[in-house]
């Protein structure tokens, strides 16, 4: 078995209590104040990263990468470009989600070739079928190649799924998190990509950020959501 494989062929269906997951998701809230003195254990953090790894992405292309910003000096510099990330930067772990740009998502790009041939190890005939359907998907079905922005937005959708699963795993462990969009993308890209060289801006853009750690205060009010009958329509 290659290092890219995760054995699941012979796994039996899980028999977990769904109430446990529902409880964790109810416990979760967008934490606005983190205890900077409390750190997530290595085992708990690795479980959160495994949730990211196991997340499904469109076509299985995994068009994302994670920057885990633990350097206090870099965190301090980031504050100048993010009006809504200040509290999150005090958390135990701070993640910048990167999404790939169009140059990496062309079917013959080195990245897609790596995914198809090395990670998935697809036979040539299956890869050829992918090529045909991908051309239809990108130009007609979802028009993800209509513009650079359309490609990046599609890629970023995958990063958001990853973030959601990481946050759910954190809640399951009794940890806290907060998804963060309160920053200037251009300025933050200039800082982290161009100035600090943490990623190649030709290939990646910043999709979203998230903080993970321990709450320093309890929620001030109960969670509110629409009722099921307000957003679920059953068509029979």
Locate the predicted segments by residue.
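Acidic, surface-exposed loops and disordered segments
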Residues: 1-236
């Amino acid at each position: 078995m290659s290092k890219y494989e995760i054995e699941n062929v012979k796994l039996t269906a899980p028999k977990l209590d769904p109430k446990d997951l529902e409880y964790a998701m109810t416990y979760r809230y967008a934490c606005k104040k983190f205890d900077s003195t409390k750190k997530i254990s290595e085992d708990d953090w690795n479980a959160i990263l495994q949730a990211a790894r196991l997340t499904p992405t469109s076509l299985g292309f995994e068009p994302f990468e994670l920057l885990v910003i633990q350097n206090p000096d870099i965190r301090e510099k980031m504050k100048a470009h993010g009006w809504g990330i200040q509290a999150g930067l005090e958390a135990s772990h701070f993640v910048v989600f990167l999404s790939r740009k169009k140059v990496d998502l062309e079917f013959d790009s080195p990245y897609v070739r790596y995914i198809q041939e090395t990670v998935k190890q697809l036979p040539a005939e299956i890869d050829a079928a992918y090529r045909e359907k991908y051309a239809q998907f990108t130009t007609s079905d979802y028009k993800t190649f209509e513009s650079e922005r359309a490609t990046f937005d599609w890629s970023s959708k995958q990063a958001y799924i990853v973030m959601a699963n990481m946050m759910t795993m954190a809640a399951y462990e009794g940890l806290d998190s907060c998804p963060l969009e309160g920053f200037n993308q251009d300025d933050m890209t200039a800082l982290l990509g161009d100035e600090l060289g943490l990623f190649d801006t030709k290939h990646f853009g910043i999709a979203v950020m998230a903080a993970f750690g321990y709450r320093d205060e309890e929620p001030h009010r109960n969670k509110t959501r629409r009722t099921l009958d307000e957003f679920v329509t059953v068509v029979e």
